[in-house]
């Protein structure tokens, strides 16, 4: 992106902020230096809280990194997957706890392209086939489909898990109040309608019967509402979880 294009984009964003009645903060540009007095070089990406942050704001590098880490985790547990005495449902629960937690870490904030989603689903399917055994086939002697594998292991699809994580995180931010910085950013993403992440979140809200950010705030005050919408059932005898 050229310098003129960057200035034009900043001017457009500043105008949008003023139109919303928000205060525009002018940040003075400073020269960052390293400890030894030399000018620090800009990096293309860096790790923050276990996630790879890309200079362009793309989720692609982090998704590829997550796929690699999940595969490594799966291989470390190969002795567990090879145990014949373990029921498939139990293996599925272990797979969800150890592999899905690595594969989908921080996925609630990803902006996923169709190609990246195919990569996630494809790797998940590959690992599940390794888990149940490549020779396992259905009654027609055909290779098991993804839906059949998910049913055998008692797992949800990758698309459903990412959607659930995103909605749960957004609900948590909404319950923290209007002054929460994360919630302010979410509202901006949804109302501007310029980001794919915000557009997809708005579509998820519509599927749940929510038409606005205010409506979402009112709905998620009742934690049981979102749990029921996501197909979860509260276990009796357990107290409510705190945010």
Spans of features found by a protein language model:
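Short linear motifs embedded in intrinsically disordered, charge-biased segments
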Residues: 1-243
């Amino acid at each position: 992106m050229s310098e003129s294009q960057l200035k034009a984009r900043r001017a457009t964003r500043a105008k949008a902020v003023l139109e919303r009645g928000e205060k525009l903060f002018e940040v003075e540009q400073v020269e960052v230096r390293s400890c030894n007095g030399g000018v620090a070089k800009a990096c293309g990406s860096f790790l923050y809280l276990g996630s790879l942050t890309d200079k362009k704001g793309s989720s692609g590098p982090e998704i590829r990194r997550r796929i690699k880490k999940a595969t490594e985790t799966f291989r470390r547990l190969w002795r567990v997957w090879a145990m014949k005495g373990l029921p498939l449902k139990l293996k599925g629960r272990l797979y969800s706890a150890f592999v899905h937690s690595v594969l989908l870490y921080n996925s609630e904030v990803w902006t996923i392209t169709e190609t990246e989603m195919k990569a996630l689903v494809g790797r998940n399917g590959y690992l599940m086939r390794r888990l149940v055994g490549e020779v396992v086939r259905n009654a027609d002697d055909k290779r098991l489909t993804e839906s059949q594998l998910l049913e055998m292991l008692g797992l949800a699809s990758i698309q459903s898990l990412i959607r659930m994580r995103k909605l749960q995180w957004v609900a948590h931010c909404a319950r923290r109040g209007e002054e929460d910085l994360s919630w302010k950013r979410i509202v901006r993403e949804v109302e501007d309608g310029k980001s794919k992440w915000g557009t997809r979140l708005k579509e998820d809200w519509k599927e749940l019967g929510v038409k606005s950010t205010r409506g979402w705030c009112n709905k998620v005050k009742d934690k049981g509402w979102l749990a029921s919408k996501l197909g979860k059932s509260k276990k009796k005898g357990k107290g409510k979880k705190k945010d």
